[in-house]
């Protein structure tokens, strides 16, 4: 997910030990908190459009998602989680500015309250 944000990254520069190798797969975890007045039909469209990216953007090895069902109550309003597995760092680099990804973001933004993204190597 690549969204412009006014929030400052907590740690923009990562230690070398945390940088992805060009051959390692990357997990891209994206959690959404929708606006309280978001139309359920618009949320379903976001679900469909995000999952459709797997067929549109090369280098996505897998994509899975689900809605929060934790009984702990610690989700802070985040309801949807998507996990995209990229073949490697190059695939993620292609994904972020890809026109289909940007089109998805334009569908998402009007109903999005907050987003949380973390990438890691499994």
Predicted regions located by residue number:
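Surface-exposed, polar helix/loop patches in the mature regions of secreted/periplasmic/lumenal proteins
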Residues: 81-122
